[in-house]
Amino acid sequence: MANDTTLIVNPMARGGWLKKKWPVIEPILQRTLGPLEIAFTKRQGDGRPLARQALEQGAKLVLAMGGDGTASEVASGLLEHQDRIAAGEPVASFGIIPAGTGGDLGRILGTPLDIEQAAQKVARSPGR
């Protein structure tokens, strides 16, 4: 892994809107967050193994970009490393960039629903 940050993206979020807008969104994220390892989900459930793989490759920050389901999958993948957590070993920080239809999790966590503002918040976070 070349980068400390992995972004797991559900391109079908918001009914495929994210896939359509990705050529505009990616440069904003790269500029705001710096170099990223980007992994795209292909089907429901992919977020979990992609998060697990990011940890195994040494990611220090794993971000979920999509809807609440994508965030849940990615968080579940990170939580599979309970052995590392129990041993007191470092596990990656987790963040979200809301891009789904409802944005409920983003609202609950106080994460801006605007993609650029959410990325700026991640960039300023202590876990970076």
Question: Where in this protein do the model-derived segments appear?
Answer:
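ATP/NTP phosphate-donor binding region
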Residues: 1-62, 72, 76, 116
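Glycine-rich beta-strand-to-loop/alpha-helix junction loops that act as flexible
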Residues: 11, 65-67, 97-99
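Catalytic core of DAGKc-family lipid kinases
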Residues: 31-32, 41, 79-128
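Positions that flank functional sites
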Residues: 44, 69, 121
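Structural signature of FAD isoalloxazine-binding scaffolds in flavoprotein oxidoreductases
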Residues: 65, 72, 123
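Short, active-site-adjacent cap segments at secondary-structure transitions
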Residues: 70-72, 104
